[in-house]
Regions:
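His-Asp-centered metal-binding catalytic motifs of divalent-metal-dependent phosphohydrolases/nucleases
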Residues: 52-71, 77, 81, 101-111
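Short alpha-helical hairpin
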Residues: 2-19
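A short glycine/serine-rich beta->alpha loop
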Residues: 24-26, 70-73
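Hydrophobic, well-structured mid-protein blocks that either form specific transmembrane helices
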Residues: 85-123
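An active-site-proximal "capping" alpha-helix that borders the catalytic cofactor pocket
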Residues: 37, 76-91
């Protein structure tokens, strides 16, 4: 793990990661994911403002309870992580107001939880996490998760779902239309939206080139 990637909060990172149970072998939600989300969050916070310490803690704890994508508990993952975040920060003697702020940001970051972010830090974290799901990293993560779940790359009989329902549990490429392209239009901050436009273009370019090869 590269603590310099968590600058300027390396000491806090060390304290928080001591409570992180790991990603249970999920390379799409490992410490490199935390590093990328923090890179995104720091870039957005530099333009939009907000409490950087709260944002950092929320970033490191946003996936602290691991739930597989195909689990029936998936929609509860951010709520479970928020509960654990409260316990962790309480053990570190954080003030209640900051604990509440971190917990809300953690709970609201998730696409599947459908919790509306009401604070700037929560909006920044949601944007930062969603940025890691689109663009070329998003492409890599999509196919990585599909491989773990045993999904096919695409439906050879109808790769573009012209005459069938989209099904991203069976076909990896369907996930672009069921989620990833939708993610790119729902950003909370001006800075996040600008970053998302660039990455959405990369997603679309990948889809176009993929379609040309099958």
């Amino acid at each position: 793990m590269s603590l310099p990637a968590f600058a300027p909060f390396q000491d806090l990172a060390k304290a928080l990661l001591a409570h992180w149970s790991g990603a249970d072998g999920d390379g799409s939600h490992d410490t490199s994911h935390l590093q990328r989300v923090w890179k995104n969050a720091a870039a957005i916070q530099a333009k939009e403002g907000g409490d950087a310490e709260v944002l950092f803690a929320a970033t490191l704890l946003h996936d602290c309870v691991a739930v597989e994508k195909d689990s029936p508990l998936r929609a509860q993952a951010s709520r479970l992580s928020a509960q654990k975040a409260r316990q962790v920060l309480k053990s570190l003697d954080w003030p209640d107001a900051k604990i509440d702020a971190v917990a809300h940001a953690v709970e609201a970051h998730s696409f599947s939880a459908c919790v509306v972010p009401t604070t700037l830090e929560a909006k920044v974290l949601q944007d930062a996490d969603r940025l890691d799901a689109i663009g070329m990293v998003g492409v890599a993560r999509c196919f990585y998760v599909a491989g773990r779940m045993g999904s096919a790359l695409y439906d050879p009989a109808d790769p573009h779902a012209s005459e069938r329902e989209l099904d991203d549990t069976r076909f990896a490429i369907d996930h672009f239309r069921t989620k990833l392209l939708r993610l790119s239009t729902g950003f909370q901050t001006v800075t996040g939206t600008r970053m998302a436009i660039v990455r959405r273009d990369r997603l679309q370019r990948f889809l176009d080139e993929f379609a040309d090869e099958i």
